[in-house]
């Protein structure tokens, strides 16, 4: 397989192209089942960071945390004090505390977990807060994109081996009140499954695919948290095949799905779903495709570039990531002027780290592609 082009700091990536990021420093070792979160900048001088939390290889579960600084483009280790080893867990950054990373569930070699842990943004240590309400049973639940506002939404997950938990309730954790709840829902929920992609876009949660025993699902379900009604969707276009252990992110009205596994191997395809038009598109790339993979993790990151623009007649559009309602979104601003000049522009990239193929090869690569 051909090598992907390397994206250097300041380079302007093309659409319909995959790139590799090669940042120096203390990089995470090859792993699966980790979480991948974009951490917004704390000060004006910062550009934000990507946090890789936990994960596993065939020999062990990890309790380490690595960060990629998007300003210096270097890897470093972050605090691991207090973090329990886990893989195939969920992570989220609630709007009430956007500089705290929460993790839920997952597993280590001894079994599944259902505890919540949070990284204190100032002390940089992990703690296990006391919560109220009825938590979900211990399970694997691998997502970094199933949160809206202060709430993490949990549906399904892994019980043991290829078997999912039989629970089809929607579990909701409120990071502001430290409370679990199981709200009443309407309609028919998805059948029990694990390894599904679950992603929030606006006020809706989308669930695609997953696995139960030897059955791979290709269905797409949605629940709107406004009315708590489940809906099985019948979208048009070219939809992903039945798969599991894939990853998804949301940008505005689009959901991007990449990778996963089928009964015949690992996938390296990316699909885009338009949430308003209910239409799937398989994306075509001008570059080589990355190696097929499963059990990887993704997030959306900003990528600043310089571009020449004539500001006399029209402003230059600046894009930024918003952490509102758990979505990555585009926020236009304009800058006016009277001459042609180099102006900063921020693109949005889908950032992919790690995973493995079905032959047992585990990855530690960083992949990016433009999303909009």
Swiss-Prot record:
Kelch repeats lie at residues 49-95, 100-146, 151-203, 204-250, 254-303, 349-372. Interacts with PIKFYVE; the interaction recruits RABEPK to the endosomal membrane. Interacts with RAB9 in its GTP-bound conformation. Residues 321-342 are annotated as: Disordered. GO terms for cellular component: endosome membrane. Its main location: cytoplasm. It is found in: Cytoplasm; Endosome membrane. Rab9 effector required for endosome to trans-Golgi network (TGN) transport. This is Rab9 effector protein with kelch motifs. Keywords: Cytoplasm, Endosome, Kelch repeat, Membrane, Phosphoprotein, Repeat. Residues 322-342 have a biased composition (Basic and acidic residues). Phosphorylated on Ser residues by PIKFYVE. The keyword ATP-binding does not apply.
